[in-house]
């Protein structure tokens, strides 16, 4: 590792510890030439995940875009930000777990829908109205009725 101060190519590791919730390793180093200390981070170099849109276009999976969608759906709802971030992380992990480099946008959308249903029903309906492109109030009502029926079925099963 090159020293950021003198560019000497050798340094020794003084301390290593997990960082970023175990997704990286923080290393404290000391330069073998100038003696100055610096910090480096080591993380897995993940291959980009590509989302295939309905029209065939491809774009790189954007975690920030997914998070923004969740934040918008959950706006003014009693859903903790940490829970939203954990859910987004879980969706990304699920998408990567299949080992495929490309995923269909519909698969991402369904994971989001299922996750929002668990998080908050109002956020679910908000997202569904955009994702499913409700054209009128009847489409909206149909989705709410499906949600209510699902809740009744769950109550009956208990």
Swiss-Prot record:
Pfam families attached to this UniProt entry: ATP-cone, Zn_ribbon_NrdR
Top-level taxon of the source organism: Bacteria
Transcription keyword on record: yes
Obligatory cofactor(s): Zn(2+)
GO biological process: negative regulation of DNA-templated transcription
Purpose of the protein: Negatively regulates transcription of bacterial ribonucleotide reductase nrd genes and operons by binding to NrdR-boxes.
NCBIfam families listed in its UniProt record: transcriptional regulator NrdR
Family in the record: Belongs to the NrdR family.
UniProt-recorded name of the protein: Transcriptional repressor NrdR
Origin species: Desulforamulus reducens (strain ATCC BAA-1160 / DSM 100696 / MI-1) (Desulfotomaculum reducens)
